[in-house]
Amino acid sequence: DHLSHDVYSPRL
């Protein structure tokens, strides 16, 4: 993962 929340793999 590179972002804490992204549209490809949403980390809620």
Curated annotation (Swiss-Prot):
<feature type="modified residue" description="Leucine amide">
    <location>
        <position position="12"/>
    </location>
</feature>
<keyword id="KW-0527">Neuropeptide</keyword>
<comment type="similarity">
    <text>Belongs to the pyrokinin family.</text>
</comment>
<comment type="function">
    <text>Mediates visceral muscle contractile activity (myotropic activity).</text>
</comment>
<keyword id="KW-0964">Secreted</keyword>
<keyword id="KW-0027">Amidation</keyword>
<dbReference type="GO" id="GO:0007218">
    <property type="term" value="P:neuropeptide signaling pathway"/>
</dbReference>
<protein>
    <recommendedName>
        <fullName>Pyrokinin-4</fullName>
    </recommendedName>
</protein>
<dbReference type="GO" id="GO:0005576">
    <property type="term" value="C:extracellular region"/>
</dbReference>
